[in-house]
Design a protein with these regions (language model features):
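Conserved acetyl-CoA-binding loop-helix of GNAT-fold acetyltransferases
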Residues: 103-116
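A short, internal acetyl-CoA/4′-phosphopantetheine-binding micro-motif in the GNAT/acyltransferase core
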Residues: 95-102
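Short beta-strand-to-coil "C-cap" segments at the C-terminal boundary of structured domains/repeats
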Residues: 153-159
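Conserved active-site alpha-helix within GNAT-family acetyltransferase domains
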Residues: 120, 124, 130-150
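Acetyl-CoA-dependent GNAT
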Residues: 30-89, 93
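Conserved N-terminal entry element of GNAT/NAT acetyltransferase domains
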Residues: 1-33
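Short, low-complexity Ser/Thr-rich regulatory SLiMs
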Residues: 82-86, 99, 145
């Protein structure tokens, strides 16, 4: 059976080239209202594994103006929200990338979309509360607070 030209180029490509092509096909865009059901479905497995906190549809609607999705051939494969607290501070929230699309740089592109939005809005700092420290360091985040200060939290409700 003769090899089709597209098959030949695929077989000649290195694994890194194939990953780069796959990643390049993914687009990052602002969230639309009609994405909400797909976002909830995307983040649900991460919530079930306690990787992400649960988000209601209402919470996602509030984040709508400052949220982004990653889309691959019409399929939603990533989500991130930027919660803007003030001109001083915003937080990256609910970053999720479909398992079969991880390690393609999609998460970094989603985080960068949030950082770019914060810059355009003049927000001074963007934070991330995460268990994936290494990932956020790759995105340019660090642990520094002025002086020897640390961020401390107290729960005001029972969960």
């Amino acid at each position: 059976m003769p090899i089709e030209p597209s098959d030949a180029s695929e077989s000649a490509a290195t694994p890194d080239e194939l990953l780069a092509r796959r990643a390049a096909a993914v687009t990052i865009r602002p969230v639309r209202f009609d994405d909400l059901d797909n976002i909830l479905a995307l983040i649900e497995p991460f919530v079930e594994r306690d990787v992400l906190l649960p988000r209601s549809e209402g919470e996602l609607i509030e984040l709508l103006p400052s949220s982004f999705v990653a889309e691959d051939a019409g399929r939603l494969v990533g989500y991130v929200g930027l919660e803007i607290y003030s001109i001083k501070l915003a937080e990256v929230r609910s970053l999720a990338v479909a398992i079969d699309h991880q390690r393609l740089g999609i998460g970094q592109r989603l985080v960068q979309a949030c950082v770019d939005l914060a810059r355009r809005k003049g927000i001074i700092e963007v934070m991330a509360i995460t268990s994936k420290e290494d990932f956020f360091r790759l995105c340019g985040f660090d642990f520094t607070l002025p002086g020897e200060k640390k961020a401390l939290f107290i729960h005001t409700t029972q969960s």
